[in-house]
Design a protein with these regions (language model features):
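Ser/Thr-centric signal marking residues that sit
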Residues: 145, 181, 246
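A short beta-strand-loop micro-motif that forms or neighbors metal/cofactor-
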Residues: 32
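Glycine-rich phosphate-binding loop of actin/hexokinase-like ATP-binding domains
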Residues: 1-3, 7-26, 66, 70-110, ...
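Tryptophan-centric aromatic hotspots in well-structured domains and transmembrane helices
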Residues: 14, 29, 44, 54, ...
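Proline-centered helix-kink/hinge sites
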Residues: 10, 125, 152, 244-245
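Gly/Ser/Thr-rich active-site cleft segment
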Residues: 35-158
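Residue-level detector of conserved catalytic or cofactor/ligand-binding positions
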Residues: 238-246
Length: 247
């Protein structure tokens, strides 16, 4: 975003693979700090940290006016509150969605990792607790939404982090299998597990919404999306005959 917290780059979702070559090059260095500080042993083309590198190298608008990197949900909340780039934020669950660049247990950006990534610390948003109040609904967006101005706005949390709470996965050794766009099998732990954070396991590690909650997840990137594709492109629902149940 620019100094006024307005978007100046396209939104890139995690299905995008434009960073594949950069990921392969960065992974070839085998930096141990990734697993040690984030729980993620290697870069991945769906990590926002890699998108940030791509934007810095390829988006002229960002090179000229870029001030902060922001996720989509914090971006919307910040604009509802009328914040500037100086007040840009990210909750600690969504922070861990960056994949690289932070200390997951300390909930802080990692100076060492960001230097490896080539991302300036000053471009990173401040890290908030999900329940922190980041501002109030502005007069402008109160008129747009029909809500009362001054309503407190909290930092919020990541979608998968919240879905774990919805599934009741809040203690170590609890697990859930969810298939939205991506099919994900998630299991809660009490922190980074060295065995699980080995590259060959191809697992991703995140911080949960609540304090001292963490989980690993394995995934099929389009596992849920494939169901819709099958329905829309393979099935001809008009030819499907549903018989009456037998008694």
């Amino acid at each position: 975003v620019d100094k006024d917290c307005h978007a100046i780059t396209p939104y890139i979702n995690y299905l995008d693979s434009r960073t594949k070559e950069d990921v392969e090059e960065l992974a070839s260095h085998h930096y141990e700090i990734w697993a040690k500080e984030t729980g993620n042993p290697q870069p991945n083309c769906m990590f926002p940290a890699m998108f940030a590198r791509w934007m810095m190298n390829n988006c002229e608008g960002f090179k000229e006016k870029g001030r902060k990197f922001m996720h989509n949900a914090p971006y919307i909340l910040a604009n509802l509150a009328g914040l500037s780039a100086e007040d840009a934020f990210i909750d600690w669950g969504t922070m861990s969605g960056w994949g690289l660049g932070y200390r997951v247990t300390e909930k802080k950006w990692s100076k060492e990792q960001l230097e490896i990534l080539g991302i300036p610390m000053e471009m990173m948003p401040k890290i908030q607790k999900p329940w922190d109040i980041i501002g109030t609904l502005s007069e402008t967006f109160a008129k747009e939404t029909g809500l009362k101005p001054g309503i407190p706005i909290c930092a919020g949390a990541g979608d998968t982090m919240q879905s774990m709470i919805g599934c009741g996965v809040i203690k170590p050794d609890q697990a859930a299998d969810v298939a939205g766009t991506c099919a994900m099998f998630c299991i809660a732990t009490d922190g980074i597990n060295e065995e699980l954070s080995k590259p060959e396991n191809e697992l991703i590690f995140n911080s949960g919404t609540l304090e001292n909650t963490y989980f690993y997840w394995g995934f099929i990137r389009t596992g849920g999306l494939a169901l819709r594709w099958y329905r829309d492109n393979v099935c001809n629902l008009s030819l499907i005959h549903i018989s009456e149940p037998t008694r």
